[in-house]
Amino acid sequence: ATVFGGTGFVGRRLVRLLRDCGIRVRAISRHRGLSQDAGIEHIAADARDQRSVEAAVDGADGVVNAISLFVQHGGDTFYSVHVETAAKIARAARQAGTRRFVHVSGIGANTASSSPYIRSRGEGEAAVQTAFPGAVIIRPAVMFASDDAFLTTILRLLRSMPAYPIFGDGKTRLQPVYVNDVAAAITQILRQGQKPYPIYELAGPRVYSYEELLRTIAHIAGLRPVLMRLPFAFWSALAGVAEMLPQPPFTRNQVELMKIDTTASKSLPGFRTLGISPRSLEDELEAIVRPNKQGVLLR
């Protein structure tokens, strides 16, 4: 199997899980992975380059596109990465005779959205399905883990700020999903013999309002912050400034995502269809918070 974005948040977990299942794996990224995992071939390649893509998918039974972009910079735009590059990989996989192609998108993807990020996700899905008929689209909710940029950022800010500003009225609904469960779902889809569904929406076992999520994190961490509601216009302006930083704490596209509910559709298949019981946010939070309750800073 070939995994594009093989050193990313989802990709690095996926390649190890595939390896552990006895599958030979190529992990494709712009920079060769530092780890020399047995059974994983790390390849430095530019997914924008047609020849590099063709070489990467050659002979692969399954191909996964897990490349994503959260901040536009240089020649990398949401459209170029989520639509053009995704379609290029899908076409190359089809021409190479790949049996199964999986494209990682996101819940909320919508071609009619005014947000360039959300719209590009929807357009990317359509481009992939055209380039590789029978492609499987994976739409995860916001993903979490001990090394994420979601829970850990919130926890750091809750620890450092006596008053915590929240997006809008705090009523936006989220259904966070453990990233390892997403990797497990993709692995199962690649391995299963029967024809998969065209779209899966993967979300955790509980739906939270944004305010409920913050209070849950604070409670498990033993914190009692004051929550301040601030309008989305304020957040958008602040995010524009934050994006100038090398590693922005949040971006304008994340602000746009916080305006819409990102919960799994009851009409689309998900973890239950695959026989997977997703891990709860509370379980992972306990693991993140436990070594930090004595004041040890998260890395």
Positions of predicted regions on the chain:
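N-terminal Rossmann NAD(P)H-binding glycine-rich loop of SDR-like oxidoreductase domains
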Residues: 1-21
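SDR active-site strand-loop-helix element
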Residues: 4, 28, 66-67, 101-107, ...
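Oxidoreductase cofactor-interface core, primarily capturing Rossmann-like NAD(P)-dependent enzymes
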Residues: 14, 20-21, 37, 111-223
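NAD(P)H-binding glycine-rich loop region in Rossmannoid oxidoreductase-like domains
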Residues: 33-95, 106-113
